Structure formats: C-alpha cells, structure tokens
C-alpha cells in the first residue's frame, strides 16, 4: 500500500484560486493537480497511490469551521485521510478540536507562516494540551518556506521548545 502523506485539495469553488496562489508562492514548485479532490484522485491513480493524507489550513480564525467541514466530507472517501486545522487566534479553537475528534479526523495541521505564530508561542499550550488529551496527531509545516521571507516560525528550535 502506498500512502502520500502530504497532499492538498480544496472545495471546487476555490480550488483554482488556491492552487494559483500556492503556485505563485511556491518558489517554482508546480502543482500536480488542479486543486480539486477529483483531480487529486486522478493523480493518485496515475501514481499508484492508494491513500492520500489531505492537509488543509485555516489561514484565519473565520476559516476553521469551513476547512474542517471540507476535511470531514473528504474523509467519507476511503481514498482520503483528511486532517483538520484550527487557527491559534480562534476563540473556539479548543471546541473545534473536540469537533475534529468527534468527526473521526486523525490529526491537526498547523502552518505557522500562514497562521502567524511561532510553534513555541505560549498561546499554543492549551491547544497542544487539548490535542494530546484527544489523542490527535499534530503536524507542522516546518522549516524554510519558499513563499515567505525570514524569520521562519517553525524551525527545529521552535519545535523543541513547543
């Protein structure tokens, strides 16, 4: 069984815009799909991938519910294992983690550059504690990112102190 642990898919209405933005910010990395779940499944078939872990990001506090609703819908397809996302500044981040867990999502993805926080920020402690209590996987987009200038928010030293 071949599992691709880092893929992205977006709702149809924003897929092309999201892929365009990621392409522009990606330092020359070209997307292999049009951003839709249908296109991702086609690419999986071409590449012999059985399961894709789909990672979405709530880039602002208002997005976390819609990002997670999409992840929950994707999870109905056995070809996908979607992770949820919470935004560190969302007032209901802890409650959203409960919803992610109750829906059967396996983990939570953070992208400190897009979400504007350091991995070792104090404000993250209650979120990390709740993730641990719920037994969810925590995944960071870490290190250098082509789309963002320094300083980087999830370098190894930040993760070690998180």
Predicted regions and their residues:
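Catalytic pocket-lining loop regions of alpha/beta-barrel enzymes
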Residues: 106-107, 120-162
């Amino acid at each position: 069984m071949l599992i691709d642990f880092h893929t992205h898919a977006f709702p149809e209405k924003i897929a092309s815009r999201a892929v365009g933005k990621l392409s522009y910010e990606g330092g020359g990395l070209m997307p292999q799909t049009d951003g839709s779940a249908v296109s991702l499944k086609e690419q999986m078939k071409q590449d012999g991938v059985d399961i894709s872990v789909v990672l979405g990001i709530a880039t602002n506090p208002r997005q976390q519910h819609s990002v997670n609703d999409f992840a929950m819908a994707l999870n109905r397809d056995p070809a996908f294992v979607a992770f949820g996302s919470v935004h560190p500044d969302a007032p209901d981040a802890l409650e959203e983690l409960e919803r992610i867990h109750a829906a059967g999502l396996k983990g939570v993805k953070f992208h400190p550059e897009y979400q504007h926080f350091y991995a070792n920020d104090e404000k993250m402690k209650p979120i990390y504690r709740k993730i641990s209590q719920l037994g969810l996987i925590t995944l960071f987009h870490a290190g250098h990112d082509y789309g963002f200038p320094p300083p980087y928010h999830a370098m190894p030293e930040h993760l070690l102190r998180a």
